[in-house]
Design a protein with these regions (language model features):
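Boundary at the C-terminal end of the N-terminal hydrophobic targeting segment
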Residues: 19-23
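Sequence/structural signature of beta-propeller domains
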Residues: 46-58
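C-terminal soluble interaction/assembly domains
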Residues: 219-238
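Short alpha-helix capping/helix-loop boundary micro-motifs
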Residues: 200-211, 224-225
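Positively charged n-region of N-terminal signal peptides that target proteins for export
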Residues: 1-7
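Acidic/His-rich structured neighborhood in mature extracellular/periplasmic domains
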Residues: 62-198, 216, 222-223
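Sec-dependent N-terminal signal peptides
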Residues: 7-16
């Protein structure tokens, strides 16, 4: 029995090492994740963990393209610099860990991988670059759910028409260096184009009971855009 436990421990260690082999992070990042998870474990079980972790990450410098730092796609864990998407992704990964009583850095990495990539496959073309694609995939996994519905306040419909990445490949370092990836990105854009999402027009938002009952603390909010080829301009947490 002792030998079996020892083998099991070694196997688990090897699995953890393998999981982190494709990750890109510093010791500061892993220490911060562990500290945040420890803080989360001390909160009441019915706490709003999205809001708790969102507040804990407020103030981190906003830096764009923090995922574009390697010649080969790797799972980037960077809690020293965030953009709007990585902010939401890290908050969600921390929340899922705490809700499911997962307490290790490897657990966090696993959730972040599943959140960021379709089917958890760490590959540039599997990364959920367009946020409407991100919404659909994370809804499928049960990590989030959409609150859009017909009628007020979701009175308008967005028909997605994406193509910005393939038309502006030179703006994306990993596409510019690997033009062979364009075909797969174009296919993702084709599948996403035509999908419809209901939304709340900005001009209609007021401080009323309708909106207060619709948008709750901790909800993930996506701001759509009219910019050609894109679906959203910004995301955040209410």
């Amino acid at each position: 029995m002792k030998t079996m436990r020892k083998i099991l421990t070694i196997l688990l260690l090897l699995l953890a090492v393998h999981a982190n082999a494709t990750a890109d992070y510093t010791r500061e990042d892993s220490v911060k994740v562990m500290r945040l998870l420890e803080e989360g474990q001390k909160q009441p079980r019915n706490a709003n963990f999205i809001l708790f972790y969102a507040r804990r990450l407020v103030g981190i410098p906003y830096i764009a393209q923090t995922l574009e730092v390697n010649s080969r796609e790797r799972l980037v864990i960077n809690l020293r610099q965030l953009d709007c998407t990585t902010y939401v992704e890290n908050v969600l990964a921390l929340t899922l860990c705490t809700q499911n009583r997962k307490t290790t850095f490897a657990d966090f990495c696993n959730y972040l991988r599943l959140i960021r990539y379709e089917d958890g496959k760490i590959d540039y073309t599997s990364r959920l670059h367009y946020f409407t694609d991100w919404i659909a995939d994370n809804t499928r996994l049960g990590f989030v759910y959409e609150i859009q519905r017909s009628g007020a306040p979701f009175t308008q419909v967005q028909t997605v028409r994406v193509g910005y990445m393939t038309r502006h490949a030179a703006d994306y370092p990993m596409l510019k260096a690997h033009p062979e990836r364009l075909k797969a990105i174009a296919e993702r854009e084709r599948k996403l184009t035509g999908k419809q999402f209901r939304y709340i027009p900005k001009v209609q938002i007021t401080n009323s009971s309708l909106y207060r009952n619709t948008i709750k603390d901790g909800d993930i909010i996506a701001i759509i855009t009219a910019k050609k080829g894109l679906d959203t301009s910004h995301i955040g947490i209410a």
